[in-house]
């Protein structure tokens, strides 16, 4: 489940 970490960064970066 590495996509979860990516999605979190995307929301935080936005």
UniProtKB/Swiss-Prot annotation:
Chief site of localization: secreted
Any single GO BP term: neuropeptide signaling pathway
One GO cellular component term: extracellular region
Residue positions where Pyrrolidone carboxylic acid is found in the record: 1
Domain of life: Eukaryota
Coiled-coil features, chain-numbered ranges: none
UniProt keyword Ligase present: no
Nucleus recorded as keyword: no
Residue(s) carrying Methionine amide: 14
Localization per record: Secreted
Pfam families, alphabetized: Bombesin (PF02044)
Family matches, as InterPro entries: Bombesin (IPR000874)
Tissue expression remark: Expressed by the skin glands.
Family in the record: Belongs to the bombesin/neuromedin-B/ranatensin family.
Protein name per its UniProtKB record: Bombesin
Organism: Bombina bombina (Fire-bellied toad)
